[in-house]
Amino acid sequence: MEAALKKLNIALQEAIDSFEGPLNQERLNELQTTESLPNKEVWSLASQTIDLADKIIHRLQPPSLQLAESFLAYLDTKCLWAAVSHDIPDLITAGGPQTVQELAKKSGLQSIRLKQVMRVLHNNGIFEYKPTTQKYSNTPSSTLLAKDHWTQWHLWVDLYGNEHYKAAEGIPDAIREGQTRCAAQIQYDTDESMFRYFARNGLQEKFHKTLGAGAVAQAPGMMADYNWGELDDAVVLDIGGGGGDFITSLLREHPSMRGGLFELDSVIEMVRPKYRDASGEFADVGDRMVDLHVGDFRVEVPAYEVYTMKWCLHNWLDEDVVKILSAVRRAIKVTPRARMVVVESVLKDGRSSRIWRFGDLTMMAGANGQEREEEDWRGLAAKTGWNIHSISPLRNAWAAAIDLRPC
């Protein structure tokens, strides 16, 4: 065992050393930047490396520490929210590397307590700490958390570190036999769906703003890694399209494409000014949004040639997904390029895919929903008159593009 560990340590140190130097740092930056997409082969290899390294950790880490990392993980969440809510990433972005005392003074915090929070975060790779100067600087991860960063990931830290955090406390009760409420309904003491509850309690805009920001942040991979060019002049209906960020990204990427949005009445009411007002956020594509539809997509959808659904079917169990896919299949205008592109997670094992497993639990807790494995998607397609033409991984996105064609 000792010889194997020594050999492993040497190999790992050699690998770390091989990453040093300007040229290799440039390749590493390709994986970590949000300004461009990484090379596909490097991205795929990096995912394999992450999975292998995680297997080594699981083999070597004492069982009690494996348990502790799970039951103490809530501290990671709240430390991250503490830093974001007190603008620590923004202060470093504006002022460069700073000591904890400098950061505490600017943010009105206790330096000893901020130090405790920052110690957790920099050991998680969020912020960098240099002992020689005792200063903190931003890493590629913490840079994303600045309020003016185009990806707006700070919104996710807020929504998931607070509203979804509270919802998750209901998971133990939600999984009991006979329980019909999801975890969020238990914790918020309501029988309404979370979408209706959030709308009634002033949280709808926060919810859709957060998911919309995620769509924008992950749009480069969503746009590049599926062949949308085949649909350049199509009219695309985005079903359950939320705040409209995804269909807007598509229209901006493809100037000849036109679009529509299908949502709940409260969401369409919120979205309409974005497209129809001259100063609206999406006014630049407003003339290419042919309609904003209200309805229940489990029953009926308008007839289009092409449909998209992003991060929507995971809100529903199989019985309802069958209804939704069947409704779209009945409505679709069958042409050689007719299709429905579902942008959703495809569950699999391994560290590099764990964000999709977190998504699975989030859907369970918030909507009584679930993410799915590839065989699940194929089974649902076969039941509802579709063939899966392709499943395309999307770089830097928490989903794949599942291309359904009518059969």
UniProtKB/Swiss-Prot annotation:
Pathway: Mycotoxin biosynthesis. InterPro entries: COMT-like, O_MeTrfase_dom, Plant_O-MeTrfase_dimerisation, SAM-dependent_MTases_sf, WH-like_DNA-bd_sf, WH_DNA-bd_sf. One of its GO terms (biological process) is secondary metabolite biosynthetic process. Gene3D superfamilies: Vaccinia Virus protein VP39, Winged helix-like DNA-binding domain superfamily/Winged helix DNA-binding domain. The active site is at residue 314. It comes from the Eukaryota. S-adenosyl-L-methionine binds at residues 263, 295-297. Its EC number is 2.1.1.-. The keyword Metal-binding does not apply. GO terms for molecular function: O-methyltransferase activity; protein dimerization activity. Induction: Expression is regulated by the cluster-specific regulator verZ. Pfam families: Dimerisation, Methyltransf_2. PANTHER family: O-METHYLTRANSFERASE CICE, PUTATIVE (AFU_ORTHOLOGUE AFUA_4G14580)-RELATED. This is O-methyltransferase verK. It comes from Clonostachys rogersoniana.
